[in-house]
């Protein structure tokens, strides 16, 4: 017993000693300053060499580090823009003062996007661009998101101030389905749209640490959508970037009062982050932007055909009765006067009016004038009630001796529309809120919860101009990560708010005071009556424009004028009534749920670097019938995928080979494999050639699959899944191509020819795919001169587009020639199709960064993209200038805290093709500039800046607003 007690006592003492030994920790404190300027360096990394322990300097450059290692220990200090430094600490009571030596950052930035693992940007196996925290801080653009537009290979499409869409390597547009945008690893797309809504949801400006851009194919690692690029936006860690920061930015736009009076611009941002202990930190942030948006003012005339509408040169409301203004809405309602007259005649005959038409034929054959025929009708009690139809019946009479046949010709007329400024909400704002909780479970495992919420009012250009009023989106993520693995789950919650369409709301207002049928009857009847001499005092020898003006004036009698109570009431009713109920409002509450994991086995597999990952997501579509065919309930779409990447360095690390492959599956489509192979060849220190073969794809978007949306002009967009062909019974009730219907109606000017009608074929959609080959070089020709060059060749297959068709409202195929003669008895449909023709594209880019003198940085890049061997008549929506370039010069500290930055961009003209309209977008150049002053003692910066400094208006795409100058001053506290 005594022996056992003695053993127990020994073991207990040993355990106490062991615990005490482990409890012996050392706390080290210090400060880091820039050795050149004496300024404190915040967010510098401090780690204990050979240990996982580490911390970051706070906003005053101070740090406190606790370690269980015995003294002496070696601290490793690192930060972008400084040389890595090691300091030995022998005494814990010693305050460590580090004088950090600045170094050139050219080519030394660490990027993750290229391979999902950290590497120097010089050693990336594929093309990549990076925007650093310092570049964001010193950019003249008012938003960090706009700074992307100065990168090599990037185009920006501006639908409105807060809705800008970056694109690379072609296929520009408002909302890019071939471009991924990830914020802290979360796909930033709106679930109902399948593309990112600009920067309406995402990081506040003071919470952005960096942005990384992969131009070109990136599906091998990032999945569907990465056909033309992937953008990664990374936030600041609350462990690394601490303290209170705020920025107040105010300015003006519309200074020349070209579109409206001078308007104020406000942008207020705040961020607070705190490390409460070595294990726990948090951050919160908010940003509010308010501005009077750029306005859509293009009044050029469109020739509309439901899918690709083109411009009519010189057309105006005054000289074109069928005028359809680009940024004018409500004039999409159009009808052929001849077809309308024929419809009136057919209705009369169906009601037993053969004696009436027979009498007219007889009078015309007898040589009576229209006035004489009217007198005959007035004197005959049996014919008198039908006198009102004479303007329709005389021009459509089949009498052999009818000099008035063809009076209407092939002329169509449209209703009088409303300018965009009366229909779209230009009171743009964007409120972003963010919060994050980070907890270190161990020295190597971090748990985090992040939430980003955004709401705002903006405008988006798709098949229509959509007023995104009070749009709301939230993204919420749980993540566990370590050095070599992560697990994350997140959701995107979308709420369309009070969003609505401009065209549908304008049509609603017009129809509120007079139906389309009544309006066209008044117009056609008045026009014909005037031309036939049936209106007293109106001669028949006047120019045709006079008769059209007379007809429009008569038809527009009682029209609601903008600003009147009648207009406002009708407009409000349109905005507050769901599209599915005949209004213009969206009612979307679609969500996305995503799960993802990644594991790096490089430490376990010694002979090759191994990376693998998998993901799964679910779309939950819920638009209450305002976008999707979901009136019966929510629609679920599941996707899952997995990827594998292998990397191997050979020949004394002069050659690095990377191979990756990904497989993805969507519920509605066959699985897709996307391999990628690349080689990085070191030809000298910090000089590398890269070669790559990449593949990419995109599944048809949620709208491509399930849309069922009634748009302007009674046109319905439908999805491309087989269920739509079944629901709409295309097999038993065929639809006809839009162009054949146009040709058929035009034949009514002489002899109607139903043989012109061509049946359209509904085919099931397939995913798009592409293959790309690239060669590039990136290297330092000196420590102060970085060059990057690339050339690529790509081949695209199974382009997704739309085909316009129509069919009779009666549902009886035998009546198709009768129904299709009039727009009032025709249902217009547009369904998704794949192009059978592959398309080839080539492109190149060249850029350099040159530290010419002290801190002066000169940058320049030029790039071009174009399609090859495009068959005549194929619509590609490529929408890309053949050539563009960027020039920049800046210095953040010219003298005593003063700095500046100037950027100039020029791009070639574009032959734009879009569902909203098609036409030439002129070439333009724009100058952005800013002057800054650092208040170093309080780590603050004052900026005076301007974008489009010369205020020369330009347009980035067809139908979008012209962008003028924005001038601002800002003050930022604790921003460097």
Residue ranges and their predicted role:
Residues 95-99, 144-147, 164-168, 179-182, ...:
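N-terminal periplasmic accessory domains that precede
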Residues 206-209, 220-232, 237-302, 428-431:
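Outer-membrane beta-barrel translocator/receptor signature
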Residues 273-279, 285-291, 428, 474-476, ...:
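Conserved C-terminal beta-signal and adjacent last beta-strands/turns
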Residues 650, 786-912, 972-974:
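Gram-negative outer-membrane beta-barrel transporters
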């Amino acid at each position: 017993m005594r022996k056992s007690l003695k053993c127990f006592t020994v073991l207990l003492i040993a355990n106490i000693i062991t615990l005490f030994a482990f409890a012996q920790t050392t706390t080290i404190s210090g400060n880091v300053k820039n050795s050149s300027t004496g300024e404190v360096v915040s967010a510098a990394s401090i780690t204990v060499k050979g240990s996982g322990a580490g911390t970051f300097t706070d906003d005053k450059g101070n740090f406190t580090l606790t370690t269980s290692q015995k003294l002496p220990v070696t601290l490793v200090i690192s930060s972008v823009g400084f040389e890595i430094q090691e300091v030995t600490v022998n005494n814990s009571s010693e305050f460590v003062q580090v004088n950090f030596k600045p170094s050139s950052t050219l080519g030394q930035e660490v990027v993750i996007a290229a391979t999902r693992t950290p590497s120097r940007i010089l050693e990336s196996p594929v093309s990549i661009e990076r925007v650093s925290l310092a570049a964001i801080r010193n950019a003249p653009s008012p938003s960090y998101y706009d700074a992307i537009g100065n990168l090599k290979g990037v185009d920006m499409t501006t639908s409105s101030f807060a809705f800008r869409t970056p694109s690379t390597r072609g296929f520009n547009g408002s909302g890019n389905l071939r471009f991924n945008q990830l914020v802290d690893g979360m796909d930033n797309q709106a679930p109902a749209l399948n593309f990112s809504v600009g920067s309406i949801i995402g990081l506040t400006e003071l919470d952005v640490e960096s942005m990384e851009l992969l131009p070109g194919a990136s599906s091998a690692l990032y999945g569907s959508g990465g056909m033309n690029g992937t953008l990664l936006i990374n936030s600041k860690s609350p462990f690394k970037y601490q303290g209170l920061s705020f920025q107040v930015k105010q300015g003006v736009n519309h200074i020349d009062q070209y579109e409206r009076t001078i308007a104020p611009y406000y942008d207020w941002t705040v961020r607070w982050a705190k490390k409460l202990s070595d294990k726990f930190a948090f951050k919160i942030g908010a940003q509010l932007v308010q501005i009077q948006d750029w306005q859509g003012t293009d009044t050029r005339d469109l020739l509309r055909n439901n899918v690709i509408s083109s411009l009519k040169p010189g057309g105006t409301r005054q000289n074109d009765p069928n005028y359809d203004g680009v940024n004018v809405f409500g004039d999409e309602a159009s009808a052929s006067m001849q077809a309308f007259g024929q419809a009136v005649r057919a209705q009369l005959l169906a009601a037993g009016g053969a004696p009436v038409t027979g009498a007219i034929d007889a009078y015309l054959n007898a040589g009576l004038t229209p006035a004489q025929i009217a007198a005959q009708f007035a004197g005959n009690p049996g014919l008198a009630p039908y006198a009102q139809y004479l303007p329709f019946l005389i021009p459509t009479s089949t009498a052999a001796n009818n000099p008035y046949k063809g009076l209407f010709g092939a002329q169509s007329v449209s209703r009088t529309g409303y300018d965009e400024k009366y229909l779209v909400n230009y009171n743009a704002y964007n409120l972003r809120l963010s919060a994050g909780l980070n907890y270190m479970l161990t020295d190597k495992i971090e748990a985090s919860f992040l939430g980003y919420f955004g709401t705002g009012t903006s405008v988006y250009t798709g098949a229509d101009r959509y007023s995104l009023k009070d749009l709301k989106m939230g993204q919420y993520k749980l993540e566990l990560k370590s050095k070599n693995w992560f697990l994350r789950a997140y959701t995107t919650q979308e709420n369309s708010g009070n969003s609505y369409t401009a065209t549908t709301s304008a049509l609603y207002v017009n129809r509120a005071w007079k139906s389309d049928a009544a309006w066209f009857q008044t117009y056609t009847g008045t026009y014909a009556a005037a031309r036939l001499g049936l209106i007293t005092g109106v001669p028949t020898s006047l120019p045709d424009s006079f008769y059209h003006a007379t007809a429009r004036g008569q038809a527009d009698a009682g029209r609601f004028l903008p600003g009147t109570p009648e207009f406002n009431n009708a407009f409000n009713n349109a905005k507050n009534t769901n599209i599915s109920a005949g209004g213009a409002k969206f009612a979307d509450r679609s969500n996305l749920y995503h799960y993802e994991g990644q594991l790096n086995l490089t430490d376990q597999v010694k002979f090759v670097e191994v990376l693998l990952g998998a993901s799964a997501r679910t779309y939950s579509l819920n638009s209450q019938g305002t976008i999707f065919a979901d009136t019966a309930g929510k629609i679920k779409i599941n996707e899952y995928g997995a990827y594998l990447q292998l990397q191997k360095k050979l020949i004394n690390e002069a050659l690095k080979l990377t191979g990756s492959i990904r497989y993805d599956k969507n519920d509605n489509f066959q699985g897709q494999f996307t391999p990628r192979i690349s080689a990085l060849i070191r030809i000298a220190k910090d000089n590398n050639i890269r070669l790559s073969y990449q593949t990419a794809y995109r599944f048809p978007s949620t709208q491509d699959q399930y849309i069922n949306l009634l748009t302007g002009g009674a046109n319905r967009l439908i999805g491309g899944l087989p269920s739509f062909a079944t629901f709409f019974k295309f097999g038993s009730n065929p639809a006809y191509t839009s162009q054949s219907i146009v040709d058929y109606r035009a034949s009514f000017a002489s002899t109607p020819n139903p043989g012109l009608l061509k049946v359209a074929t509904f085919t099931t959609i397939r995913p798009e795919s592409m293959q790309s080959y690239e060669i590039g070089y990136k290297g330092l020709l000196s420590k102060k001169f970085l060059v990057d060059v690339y050339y690529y060749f790509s081949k695209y297959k199974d382009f997704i587009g739309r085909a316009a068709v129509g069919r009779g409202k009666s549902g009886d195929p035998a009546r198709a020639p009768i129904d299709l003669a009039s727009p009032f008895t025709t249902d217009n449909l547009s369904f998704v199709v794949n192009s059978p023709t592959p398309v080839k594209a080539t492109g190149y880019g060249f850029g350099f960064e040159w530290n010419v003198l002290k801190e002066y940085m000169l940058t320049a890049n030029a790039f071009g993209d174009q399609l090859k061997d495009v068959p005549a008549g194929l619509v590609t929506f490529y929408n890309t200038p053949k050539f563009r370039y960027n020039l920049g010069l800046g210095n953040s500290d010219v003298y005593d805290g003063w700095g500046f930055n100037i950027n100039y961009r020029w791009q070639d003209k574009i032959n734009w093709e879009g569902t909203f309209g098609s036409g030439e977008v002129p070439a333009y150049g724009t100058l952005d500039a800013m002057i800054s002053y650092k208040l170093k003692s309080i780590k603050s910066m004052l900026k005076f800046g301007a974008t489009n400094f010369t205020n020369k208006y330009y347009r980035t795409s067809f139908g979008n607003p012209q962008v003028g100058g924005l001038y601002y001053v800002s003050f930022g506290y604790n921003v460097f």
